[in-house]
Amino acid sequence: MAAPKKTQKRMPRRREEFTYRGYKIDELKAMGLSELIPLMPARARRKFNRGLNRGEETLLEKIRGGDEKIRTHLREMIVMPEMIGKSIEIYNGKEFLKVEFQPESVFHYLGEFALTRKRVTHGSAGIGATRGSKYVPLK
């Protein structure tokens, strides 16, 4: 007779807290723009050194103000740390796609999260589509 097996409780997986170049998200949110710029990738750093346009500034004001429904066409805007946890609707050329920002999306462009093209799914050929389909019996 075998001894009963001991069942071990499985510990839930602990997700490591996200850091960006050694800084936690809370630390990034507390930093000013002048402190964030050296941490950004080169393309984003160049954009912020040139300055934000009026539309980008108003988008940041809406986010800081706590508006619940934010819609934007600004696909070239960069995800700032204060956008983390917020949901923004981004226009993809046809419709607004709702995007919830995770910590991993810091300093990416908004346009990366609302794709403008769909994958093509071709259907089967219909009646009259090809010469061979002329002889398909109709139901």
Swiss-Prot record:
Keywords: Ribonucleoprotein, Ribosomal protein, RNA-binding, rRNA-binding. It comes from the Archaea. One of its GO terms (cellular component) is cytosolic small ribosomal subunit. GO terms for molecular function: rRNA binding; structural constituent of ribosome. The keyword Lipid biosynthesis does not apply. GO terms for biological process: ribosomal small subunit assembly; translation. Belongs to the universal ribosomal protein uS19 family. Protein S19 forms a complex with S13 that binds strongly to the 16S ribosomal RNA. PANTHER family: RIBOSOMAL PROTEIN S19P FAMILY MEMBER, SMALL RIBOSOMAL SUBUNIT PROTEIN US19. This is Small ribosomal subunit protein uS19. It comes from Methanoregula boonei (strain DSM 21154 / JCM 14090 / 6A8). The lineage of its organism: Archaea, Methanobacteriati, Methanobacteriota, Stenosarchaea group, Methanomicrobia.
